[in-house]
Amino acid sequence: MSQTKDFVLYGEHFNSRFLLGTALYASPQLMRDSIEKSRCDIVTLGLRRQNPANRDGDTFWQYIQDSGCRLLPNTAGCKSVKEAVTLAEMSREIFDTDWIKLEVVGDDYNLQPDPFGLVEAAGILIKQGFKVLPYCTDDLILCKRLLDVGCQVLMPWGAPIGTGQGLLNRYNLRSLRERIKDVPMIIDAGLGAPSQAAEAMEMGYDGILLNTAVAKAHNPPLMAEAFADAIDAGRKAYNAGLMQKRQTASPSTPTLGQPFWHNQ
């Protein structure tokens, strides 16, 4: 499992291990308050959903700028390599960043990443100087192929986007973390509760990226704070070292010094 103490992505250090999406909020104000409560250093946003070119009077864009967070544009909704590469290139020009959350969707039903298109697009973008953070499944071979083409971060899903199902395949996620020890890995998508984020961090994952679980909560800022606390707690638990599970009970109270008649 990852022994990295600092949260470092492409050579850049971050204080928070929480990456928050900016879509689906009922209002820009709720989004701003949620970003603040999340204590995040990175926010994701999609070029297709916003038009930052029109910045005058754009409340959304102004709030994003005021947050001071690093921008992580995404290629959400892209279904082909060409489409994803083109959108990434446009995002670099508009948002003035070479960071990109790469998404190539292969199925409309569960929004599962297209593994073949994802690897191809990642290779193209990395050759163009992009810092690619690929949204992928928990498939070990896919993750290895992404590393082979130059990705320095992996973002496997916990469950399909927006489902709130949590960590559906714990075996795969644990195996992935154990097999790929020294690469930052962020659980991206599918989480619905802070407890699920804490569990992922306890497994040794380096960070959490989510959107819907906060944006669709009854109180998004409070939920953002809850996730931030859970992520911190999960990381502390991982660093502390969890006890091993046992099949039999073991008393936690010592018997030394008890009266002799106790055993009669």
Swiss-Prot record:
GO terms assigned for molecular function: thiazole synthase activity
Active site: K101
Swiss-Prot/TrEMBL GO biological process terms: thiamine diphosphate biosynthetic process
List of residues binding 1-deoxy-D-xylulose 5-phosphate: G162, A189, G190, N211, T212
Region (Disordered): 245-264
Functional pathway: Cofactor biosynthesis; thiamine diphosphate biosynthesis
Primary residence: cytoplasm
Subcellular location: Cytoplasm
Gene3D superfamilies in UniProt: Aldolase class I
Cellular component terms per the entry's GO annotation: cytoplasm
EC id: 2.8.1.10
Description of how the protein assembles with itself and partners: Homotetramer. Forms heterodimers with either ThiH or ThiS.
Role: Catalyzes the rearrangement of 1-deoxy-D-xylulose 5-phosphate (DXP) to produce the thiazole phosphate moiety of thiamine. Sulfur is provided by the thiocarboxylate moiety of the carrier protein ThiS. In vitro, sulfur can be provided by H(2)S.
Family: Belongs to the ThiG family.
Protein name: Thiazole synthase
Organism: Cellvibrio japonicus (strain Ueda107) (Pseudomonas fluorescens subsp. cellulosa)
